[in-house]
Amino acid sequence: MKTYMQTAEQKSEKWYLVDATNMPLGRLASQVASILRGKNKPEFTPNQLCGDHVIVINSDKVLLTGRKVEQKFYRYHTGYMGGLKEISYSTMLSEKSDLAVTVAVKGMLPKNSLGRKMLKYLRVYKDANHGHEAQKPELIELDGRR
């Protein structure tokens, strides 16, 4: 069986709106990453950009289960000796909650140039205000069992 190849005329991009209120971070990120990849479409092609745009609102109300709020750290290195920096999740949530969701989704996308293009289709906002009413985003309910 041959791999389906999507042409430019067949490409259709939709906009989805996701409310992150009281959703576990991992469940939210995995389902958003699936939409960004286009896995929810019948014309999914793994080597093409066929996903949809996703707007995540209320990122400051996302949940972590267990004791991860105190124990989870985001680490990065500046490139200089002794330049390991770490930020706790509680600090990240209070200061940059949109970045916490973006990092979680980024980790679930492919680690190549196609994954970087998919990440540009993601918009994350701390509150319910977003400037994408002109795109007429469709509100979808994700499975956020807890």
Name each model feature, range by range.
Residues 127:
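Short, well-ordered beta-to-alpha junction loops that form the rim of enzyme active sites
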Residues 106:
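Acidic, metal-associated active-site segment
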Residues 1-103, 113, 121, 131-146:
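Ribosome large-subunit tunnel/peptidyl-transferase-proximal elements
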